[in-house]
Design a protein with these regions (language model features):
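Flexible, glycine/threonine- and acidic-rich loop/arm segments that mediate assembly and lattice contacts
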Residues: 1-78, 91-93, 170-212
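Residues in well-ordered beta-strands of folded domains
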Residues: 8, 86, 143
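Long, positively charged binding patches that form subdomain-scale interaction surfaces
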Residues: 55-136
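Sequence/fold signature of self-assembling virion shell proteins
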Residues: 106-212
Length: 212
């Protein structure tokens, strides 16, 4: 499914700050809003995982989250091709202290590779502190439509693909009737997990903390 959005920059804002500053500010805010649409849906599903439990330490919660999803796939007669883990950013730095880590970014998600037995670890404030979420890599599915598709251009709808995210297409044009600059965006990315019962939600502490 392709989703369509529009955001405008007023003539007054351009006159006050200049075209480049006014449009760049709106562009970044627009891009952030659209990225959040994708991530919010995905995180809502991750937080609904049914492999729930709790452990006394963050390190144990991390290990058990991995163990539970690998074990679940084995019970399903499937083989996990790897494991992705989601944690709160502050928990990572509390655990590591001053140690150097290499953090990469893709599609607006910050992540590390090959950390504590996980193939990929995503760091985000969307995950509560003291919670570790995990799922096999091959439990995740992505549907993607290229916003720069030449078929759109043939229809007179030419979009420039945002180089940072890779999944948002932008087009800007002036609208004289309203004296504004309209920014149009299309987005065709959906991330989801095929099996909710292959998502682990492990809390640190004396009890489970998942709320649905």
């Amino acid at each position: 499914k392709i989703e369509k959005y529009r955001k405008s920059v007023s003539l007054e804002a351009i006159a006050e700050r200049g075209y480049d500053a006014a449009v760049q500010s709106t562009d970044e805010e627009f891009k952030s809003d659209l990225t959040n649409v994708v991530s919010d849906r995905f995180y809502a599903q991750l937080k609904a995982g049914s492999l729930v439990g709790h452990e006394s330490t963050w390190q144990m919660a991390f290990a058990m989250a991995i163990g539970k999803v690998v074990n679940k796939f084995q019970e399903m007669k499937r083989t996990a091709t790897g494991v992705a883990v989601w944690v709160n950013t502050l928990d990572v730095y509390k655990y590591l202290g001053a140690a150097d880590i290499t953090v990469q970014t893709a599609f607006g998600f910050k992540y590390m590779k090959n950390f504590m037995g996980a193939d990929v670890v995503f760091m985000t404030s969307q995950i509560p502190e003291g919670v570790v979420i995990a799922t096999p890599l091959n439990n995740m599915v992505a549907y993607y439509v290229d916003p720069g598709d030449s078929e759109f251009a043939k229809a007179g709808l030419q979009y420039t693909t945002d180089p940072t995210t890779g999944f948002i297409g932008f087009h800007v044009q002036g609208t004289y009737e309203r004296a504004i600059s309209d920014m149009f965006a299309i987005m065709g990315l959906r991330l989801f997990c095929e099996y909710l019962d292959a998502i682990a939600y492990i809390s640190v502490g004396d009890s489970d903390t998942q709320t649905l």
